[in-house]
UniProtKB/Swiss-Prot annotation:
InterPro entries: Lipid_transp_b-sht_shell (IPR015819), Lipovitellin_superhlx_dom (IPR011030), Vitellinogen_b-sht_N (IPR015816), Vitellinogen_b-sht_shell (IPR015258), Vitellinogen_b-sht_shell_sf (IPR037088), Vitellinogen_open_b-sht (IPR015255), Vitellinogen_open_b-sht_sub1 (IPR015817), Vitellogenin/Apolipophorin (IPR050733). Induction: By steroids (estrogen). Expression of VTG II is lower than that of VTG I. This is Vitellogenin-2. It comes from Fundulus heteroclitus (Killifish). Precursor of the egg-yolk proteins that are sources of nutrients during early development of oviparous organisms. Residues 1-15 form the signal peptide. The keyword Signal applies. Residues 1088-1127, 1148-1169 have a biased composition (Low complexity). Phosvitin, an egg yolk storage protein, is one of the most highly phosphorylated (10%) proteins in nature. The keyword Disulfide bond applies. Keywords: Disulfide bond, Glycoprotein, Phosphoprotein, Signal, Storage protein.
Length: 1687
């Protein structure tokens, strides 16, 4: 019994241990049938697809424990390109034969429990073929768990290690085991792929990918297995891989790749499978092995037999095809050359260079192609050629820049770039060294993006450079090194950078501010990898309020680049509530405000945090003017398409000046789930404005500075600010990397000026002129590999899949120039000789460009390609032949365009999407199928004359669009391809014999789905053709200009007018109209209808050759006349083509009643603002009228128009009495020598001050022309009449400009009136009117619905004051007005006009003066009230008889000092100005202001006074005296009996000090004392700027001095008895003097212990540096009386 129980137990345990893992029994061979294929294209049927199929028998047998052999039998490789599913796969017989040796070779693999381990193969099997074996073996990879039926795990496969989901189901009835394995390709921990191109420049946008995807894929495998005791047998396995890709979100349609594999069990052979007798070496695991995929471009498949010979052939083809003209296929040939160079060995490239380096064209193409190789081989070649000196500096710069961006970053490339930087040829050229160094940083960054754990040793050489430069205090070297570290963005660089930042490095304070800013900006890229580390540093910089505001604002830019969390943004907001610097406050607030509206996904959390922060802050911060720093950010993101763009701009100022100190701007693009900083630039200027405007000829006099400093010596602890050194810097970033920068200082500017004025530039100019005279020709071509973006990854079949974008271009130009000069120039000629010569030049220029762009998705292996390819080919060529002649002495200029034969298409653009299948053994049999099948259609054309384009262009476009109406698209069946869109638009100018046509042909897949990707896929073309127009042959187009007396000789068509005949014709028309119209109508009405009728008939003159067109024209004319007549009956307003303004005066009495009634009806709804403009308008008084006596005002109100009419009627055309002063001919020279074109003649009559311009058509019997008559009726009025049409009678406008007065202020009024205008001008005017209305409302311009004259526009501009205008614009339906429109400059009127007399004859100085005056900062003192430069008002009690510093230059230059003294007896202010080497005193005396220069009084009769240098002027203004010295920083100092006014120029802002403040806009830091401490009250601040007396015998009678006062009582501070002294000294009488007047002031007191030895005799400097412990009230003396015995 026990034996039976034991047997049952053993059997039960054995039954539970059945293995589900596949097992292959030793000694047997398992035969399977394998088939796998890949198809790519759009998912819909009826479109073309491309694919590859692999079929074979598969034999598997055991080779040992856990070791197996796999062998293929009868493999077949097929390709597919055709309409799916109609076409079939076509076997690639030659390719199969070529690969059969490798495919039939068995491979070994480890296999245990369903998991494949290592793979072994002989060396003869290439990596590409072995990957195919891996794709097959992947079908047998399975991790089966006995205890679970549903589970997830990270499984190794061909594509790497990805998340895999298992479902196991056992069918006990059928004795089958069903397994489903699904692999999510979007969640791989170790994905096998290769990225080429933009990988180092883009940033992944995780938030964007959460909203949509551009690439998605999954693999599903179904197994049917038969379980057994020894293991399961795989009966069938089916795998399906689906991959979708779209650059604009796969939800909106995508190109897909579908791969399917099937393995079907066939039989078990009893014989074992034997391996080859060869060395089986380990070849990796089941993971796909990347090999030569980078070398193979998917655009074309090359069969390479002799790479050197093929390179030579390709190079010769490129050179020959692009000799001065870019061939259409050149970009593709260029890509072919690059592919061949990638395959070639380094020695072969060296041999090619040696062969072609002396041939300029071949050399040029080689140097442009080698960087595109994309490996360190290119860098090695470039380095060796630079070291050997075989390339020029320009060639080296081009090669370095190209290779930096195109070469794939690896350790070898980084070492080569590092070594290149230290080569002598590079170190000696500063520009090349900068390029190499910046490129080194870019290379490190690209490497670290692909290898996040890159070592810090990569950037250690730059760290060493920083250490050495810091020891030498070499700011330029530090700036370069910081930009390199900024490009690299390695976290290990944080410590070296921090050493250069104030507050972190001990030596940082000795460095220039620009170094601090560069160091801060270098943190930006590090912050994208380590945001927390950078946030700590940048926040500390911002919080340190002792640092320069510019540095703090740059730190904020760095902070926001790290995508701040809510907590930090709230911290910033709380800090701003107590921020004393308004520049910083304005910048941060505006940056936060801008981010509240962001729509980009990656900044959504920042936007939410900024919305909270803005609520914390006060909205009044937004009211700060644009003189304060600002940050701007605008963006837009379209979620459905995953497309977006963002732009940021930073305007950084430091003293509220007009010109900012720093400007930065950046543009970012979002595409396909990544973002890239496309372009960034910055410009920084410090002291540039000052360097341009301040006096340059002021001698650096030691005596002057000594005198200035002596006056300020008494100021307690006064500290001079450092003078600004003129410095400018520029930088440019492309794709987020610094590529170029420049620091511009005085030395560089001097070098540029020296070069521009030196003999070398003259020598070069002479050589260029000699080359032109001897004949110059050049044929130039330049290839560019602009974009190569590739994403390579394996498919489940083991074939490489590629998504790529290529752009290549070739530009070319052919130039031939021949010049002649008569008479010939002497050898030592001066450039002025050219102005006296007759210069002729012939030139032929042919610029051309060819651009190819390819987008590829599909299989790309060295032996077979099957892909969907979109290729765009753009080509443009614009050949020109021209001749020019210039004779300045004779005033003659001509320019001729000569026809170019054989050129029709000047521009073309084609885009097609095709399915391609080809293999390397059968390239001739490659099959290319359009994805959208082609279906021919007859095109419909619409040809237009250029003269009709403005009327009919829109109609023609819409008509041609009807070829494929929208409804037809919707009605098209699912499988029926709609007809293509075909359009042809032409414009013809018969005058010059040119016809231009645009042909459009388009067919796409939007009939299936209307999304962007479907719209792109198809065939599209656009052609721009220029051909000779039908008609007479044109030899050339010529432009001639003749000035002077010979202008009459160039007149080809005399313009005459038979006035009697014209008048007679008008009378006949009037008689006919008189019978039709009512008797009440006046003659002017008849004239208007007549004009309208003649206008209509003249419009059809061009078709008058045929009787039908003539009759239709007559009918149109008749109907037009009748319509005009009927409309005139309804409207009593009168028209006259002669002069609309004159008619207005004729009918003024008759229209007065209607205008008054209309104004009364509208007055009930008028507002107060309306009353303002009406008053402003009615007060306009003409200066022209004031020339006449008052008694004749009514008579002369029409004198201007009447005089114009009388002169015009007397002499219609000035050609009858004067010769033209200028003649311009723009004509086509016909073969039959008939005139064709236009003639412009300008006449001037001095007697009547009349200018007439006549534009006439040169065609015989064509009377169309434009006539413009301008006449100066007086010094205050100018009138212009412009008429055009046949005989200048169809259309009429009149413009009158006149000066006048509005409430005694100067004004200008311009009127535009018309009688009749063309339809297109009226339409355009309506659009302009709507635009003006919209813009006016947005800019605070008032608008009233007040009707004006129906055919008149009037603009009135009146002076409100020297800096503002009152503007009124009257239109027929609205009136716009703006009162007090502020100007950015002073008008040259009143006081400004008088001040400009000092610059008489120097208009540039006058303009500069008006601009600087408007930007000046102003300070005013009235009695004891001061209004500072920053517009802050305070009252002060001034010590008697003491001078105070009102304003001064606080730099070490001390360009000026303005002292103020209060005469307490007379209660008036006196000022003393120390400027340059003179002292100017101004003081009131006997109700007048007296001025002394160096102690000598200047009588008022001798004013204005001009200093000998010409930079200082003293003049009388109103009731006072003013001094002007803008080039010294003082715009104006003015003193009257009751007011003192000081104005400093804009570039002095932030550099002044004194009672008026710093003029820096910082009102929160207004009370700045001489030692730069901010006082707590105005009194202490004012007293700090008083100059104390030296002794009680001082002539100034200021018997006081500053003292630090000890607190009279002892206090307990922090538990210790202390004595306190004032840190803000107060005024006390000198020893021996007693106070007679005092005041109380609040002072801050630092305290020391009672044991301290500090007493009054000790130096007070240590006290002034201490912080304030307590505040107390102290007594300050204002007036003292001294005893005779005082010292």
């Amino acid at each position: 019994m026990r034996v039976l129980v034991l047997a049952l137990t053993v059997a039960l345990v054995a039954g539970n241990q059945v293995s589900y893992a596949p097992e292959f029994a030793p000694g047997k061979t398992y035969e399977y049938k394998y088939e796998g294929y890949i198809l790519g294209g759009l998912p819909e049927e009826g479109l073309a697809k491309a694919g590859v199929k692999i079929q074979s028998k598969v034999l598997i047998g055991a080779a040992g424990p856990d070791s197996y052999i796999l062998k293929l039998e009868d493999p077949v490789i097929s390709g597919y390109s055709g309409i799916w599913p109609k076409e079939v796969f076509h076997p690639a017989t030659k390719l199969t034969s070529a690969l059969s040796a490798q495919l039939l070779t068995p491979v070994k693999f480890e296999y245990a429990n369903g998991v494949i381990g290592k793979v072994f193969a002989p060396p003869g099997i290439s990596t590409n073929v072995l990957n195919v074996f891996r794709g097959l073996l992947n079908m047998f990879q399975m991790n089966i768990k006995k205890t679970q039926n549903v589970y997830d795990l990270q499984e190794t496969g061909v594509k790497g290690v990805c998340k895999t989901h298992y479902i196991l189901h056992e069918d006990s009835k059928a004795d089958r085991l069903h397994l489903t394995k699904t692999t999510d390709l979007n969640h791989c921990t170790d994905s096998i792929h290769m990225d080429v191109g933009m990988a180092g420049y883009t940033e992944k946008c995780a938030e964007c990918m959460a909203r949509g995807k551009t690439l998605s894929g999954a693999i599903s495998v179904n197994y049917i297995m038969k379980p057994s005791a020894s293991g399961t047998l795989i009966l069938e396995a089916t795998a399906t891989e689906l991959l979708q890709y779209s650059p604009v979100n796969i939800v909106n349609g995508a190109v897909q790749m579908e791969a399917k594999q099937t393995v079907t069990f066939v039989d078990i052979r009893k014989t074992p499978l034997e391996p080859l007798k060869a060395d089986y070496i380990p070849r990796g695991s089941l993971k796909y092995e990347l090999g030569t995929e980078f070398l193979q471009t998917p655009i074309q498949l090359l069969r390479i037999t002799n790479v050197e010979a093929q390179i030579v052939e390709s190079l010769n083809n490129l050179v020959s095809l692009n000799m001065g003209h870019a061939h259409e296929d050149s970009p593709l040939k260029f890509i072919e050359l690059i592919q061949l160079l990638r395959v070639a060995k380094y020695e072969s490239i060296e041999a090619l260079w040696s062969q072609f380096k002396t041939k300029i064209d071949h050399r040029h193409w080689l140097l442009s192609s080698i960087p595109a190789i994309g490996t360190h081989v290119a860098l090695k070649f470039i380095k060796e050629k630079i070291v050997a000196g075989e390339v020029t500096a320009a060639e080296a710069a081009q090669a370095i820049m190209s290779s930096t961006h195109l070469v794939k970053a690896d350790l070898e490339a980084i070492k080569l770039q590092e070594g290149l930087a230290v080569t002598p040829n590079i170190r000696e050229n500063a520009g090349l060294r900068e390029l190499v160094m910046l490129g080194f940083g870019i290379m490190v960054h690209k490497y670290c993006v692909e290898n996040p754990s890159c070592p810090s040793e990569l950037v250690r050489p730059v760290h060493d450079i920083i250490a050495k430069a810091l020891e030498k205090r070499d700011n330029d070297e530090l700036s370069l090194a910081l930009k390199v570290l900024g490009n690299a963005g390695h976290p290990s660089s944080l410590k070296p950078i921090m050493k250069l930042l104030p507050g972190f490095g001990s030596s940082a304070s000795e460095l220039e501010l620009r170094v601090h800013i560069d160091a801060t900006l270098a943190l930006r890229k590090i912050g994208k990898r380590e945001p927390k580390m950078i946030q700590d540093v940048a926040l500390q910089l911002f919080m340190d309020r002792t640092l320069d505001p510019e540095l703090r604002m740059v730190a904020v830019v760095v902070l926001f680049d790290t995508k701040l969390p809510m907590g930090l943004i709230t911290t910033l907001a709380q800090s701003l509530l107590k921020e004393p610097n308004l520049q910083v406050l304005s910048f941060v607030y505006s940056y936060m405000k801008a981010f509240t509206k962001t729509t980009t996904p990656d900044h959504s959390t920042v936007a939410a945090a900024c919305n909270v922060a803005i609520r914390i802050l006060s909205p009044r911060f937004e009211r700060l003017s644009y003189r304060y720093s600002r940050a701007f950010h605008y963006d837009h993101y379209h979620n459905p398409w995953m497309l977006g763009a963002a732009a940021s701009a930073f305007y950084i100022n430091d003293a509220a000046t007009v010109l900012p100190k720093n400007i930065m701007a950046k543009a970012r693009v979002y595409l396909s789930g990544v973002s890239v900083d496309v372009l960034e630039f910055g410009a920084r200027a410090e002291g540039v404005q000052e360097a341009l405007l301040k006096a340059r000829d002021v001698p650096e006099s030691a005596d002057r500075l000594t005198k200035m400093k002596q006056a300020l010596k008494a100021l307690t602890e006064w500290r001079a600010n450092p003078s600004r050194q003129p410095l400018g810097s520029l930088y440019v970033k492309v794709l987020g990397q610094d590529v170029a920068f420049a620091n511009i200082d005085k030395e560089m500017v001097e070098k540029i000026i020296e070069f521009a004025t030196g003999p070398e530039i003259r020598t070069r100019g002479k050589k260029a002129l000699d080359a032109l005279l001897s004949g110059y020709s050049m044929k130039y071509s330049k290839p560019m590999s602009a974009i190569e973006v590739r994403h390579i990854f394996p498919t489940s079949l083991g074939l490489p899949m590629e998504l790529s974008l290529y752009t290549a271009a070739v530009t070319a130009a052919s130039v031939e120039v021949q010049a002649t000069i008569s008479p010939p120039l002497p050898e030592d000629f001066h450039p002025a000789h050219l102005l006296k010569s007759d210069i002729s030049m012939k030139a032929s220029v042919t610029p051309s460009v060819s651009l190819h762009t390819y987008g590829v998705m599909g299989v790309n292996s060295p032996f077979i390609q099957a892909s969907v390819l979109s290729r765009a080919k753009d080509h443009a060529a614009l050949p020109k032949k021209m001749e020019a002649r210039l004779d300045i002495v004779k005033g003659y200029f001509s320019y001729q365009f000569l026809p170019v034969e054989g050129v029709k298409t000047i521009a073309s653009a084609r885009l097609e999407t095709v399915a391609i299948a080809r293999d390397v053994e059968g390239l001739a049999a490659a099959k290319v199928t359009p994805v959208v099948p082609y279906e021919p259609i007859v095109s419909k054309n619409a040809t237009l004359n250029l003269s009709q384009m403005s009327y009919y262009l829109n109609d023609s476009i819409s008509a041609s669009s009807e070829l494929l109406p929208f409804s037809l698209q919707r009605q098209t069946g699912k499988n029926k391809i709609p007809k293509p869109i075909v359009k042809k638009m032409c414009a013809t100018t018969y005058t010059y014999g040119i016809e231009g046509c645009v042909d459009i042909w388009s067919r796409n897949a939007t009939f299936l789905r209307n999304t962007p990707i479907y719209a792109i896929i198809g065939n599209h073309s656009l052609l721009v053709n220029v051909t000779p127009a039908a008609g007479p042959s044109i030899e050339r187009i010529e432009i001639e200009v003749q000035f002077g007396e010979q202008a009459a000789e160039k007149i080809l068509k005399e313009v005459y007018l038979n006035e009697e005949e014209e008048v007679l014709e008008d009378k006949n028309v009037l008689m006919k109209l008189k019978k039709i119209l009512s008797p009440g109508l006046k003659n002017s009405t008849k004239a208007s209808s007549s004009s309208s009728g003649s206008s209509r008939s003249s419009r059809s003159r061009s078709s008058s050759s045929s009787s039908s067109s003539s009759s239709s024209s007559s009918s149109r004319s008749s109907s037009s006349s009748s319509r005009s007549s009927s409309s005139l009956r309804r409207n009593s307003k009168m028209l006259d083509l002669a002069d609309p303004l004159n008619i207005t005066s004729k009918r003024s009495s008759s229209s007065s009643s209607s205008s008054s009634s209309s104004s009364s009806s509208s007055s009930s709804s008028s507002s107060s603002s309306k009353t303002k403009w009406q008053l402003h308008e009615r007060n306009f008084t003409k200066d022209h009228i004031h020339q006449h006596s008052v008694s004749k005002e009514r008579l002369n109100s029409k004198s201007s128009a009447s005089s114009f009419e009388s002169i015009y009627n007397k002499i219609t055309y000035l050609s009858n009495i004067v010769s033209p002063v200028v003649t311009v001919l723009v004509r086509a020279i016909r073969a039959d020598h008939k005139n064709q074109g236009y003639q412009i003649a300008v006449y001037y009559d001095k007697l009547t001050t009349r200018v007439q311009i006549i534009v006439a058509n040169l065609t015989e019997d064509d009377n169309w022309r434009i006539c413009s008559d301008s006449m100066m009726l007086s010094h205050h009025k100018v009138m212009t009449r412009v008429t055009w049409g046949i005989g200048c009678k169809q259309y009429n406008t009149t413009i009158v400009a006149e000066t006048g007065r509005v409430e005694k202020e100067p004004a200008v009024r311009v009127k535009l009136a018309w009688a009749r205008l063309p339809t297109y001008i009226r339409d355009y005017a309506r659009r302009v009117s709507r635009y003006i209305s919209r813009v006016a409302e947005d800019n605070g311009v008032n608008r009233t619905k007040v009707a004006s004259k129906p055919k008149e526009i009037k603009l009135t501009v009146a002076v409100a004051n020297e800096t503002s205008l009152n503007v009124t614009l009257n239109t027929p339906k609205n009136t716009f007005f703006k009162l007090g429109w502020v100007l950015p400059f002073y008008l040259p009127i009143n006081n400004t006009a008088a001040e400009l007399q000092a610059f008489q004859g120097r208009w540039m100085d006058q303009v500069t003066y008006m601009l600087t005056k408007s930007a000046a900062a102003e300070c005013t003192v009235v009695e004891d009230t001061v209004v500072t430069f920053n517009n802050r008002k305070y009252k002060t009690e001034t010590p008697h008889s003491c001078h105070q510093v009102l304003a001064q230059d606080c730099t070490s230059e001390i360009k000026f000092i303005v002292l103020l003294k209060r005469d307490q007896t007379a209660e008036r202010n006196e000022i003393s100005i120390k400027i340059e080497n003179i002292d100017v005193d101004m003081y009131p005396k006997d109700n007048a202001v007296v001025v002394k220069v160096n102690g000598v009084e200047i009588p008022l009769t001798n004013l204005p006074y001009q200093h000998p240098t010409g930079n200082i002027q003293i003049r009388q203004r109103e009731e006072g005296i003013s001094l002007h010295a803008p080039s010294h920083g003082l715009q104006e100092v003015f003193l009257s009996l009751n007011k003192v006014q000081v104005k400093v120029v804009d570039w002095m802002r932030g550099q002044t000090c004194g009672l008026c403040g710093k003029a820096d806009g910082e009102v929160r830091q207004e009370y700045s004392t001489p030692n730069e401490r901010v006082s707590r009250n105005a009194t202490s601040f004012a007293h700090s700027w008083v100059l104390p007396a030296k002794s009680c015998r001082d002539a100034s009678e200021c018997y006081m001095q500053l003292e630090s006062v000890k607190l009279e009582k002892q206090i307990s501070l922090e538990g210790e008895e202390s004595k306190c002294y004032s840190v803000e000294p107060v005024w006390r009488c000198l020893p021996g003097c007693a106070p007679v007047r005092t005041t109380s002031v609040t002072v801050g007191l630092p305290c020391v212990s009672l044991d301290s030895n500090l007493n009054r005799s000790d130096s007070l400097s240590s006290i002034y540096q201490k912080s304030v412990d307590v505040s107390e009230t102290a007594e300050s003396h204002l007036a003292c009386r001294c005893t005779p015995q005082c010292a």
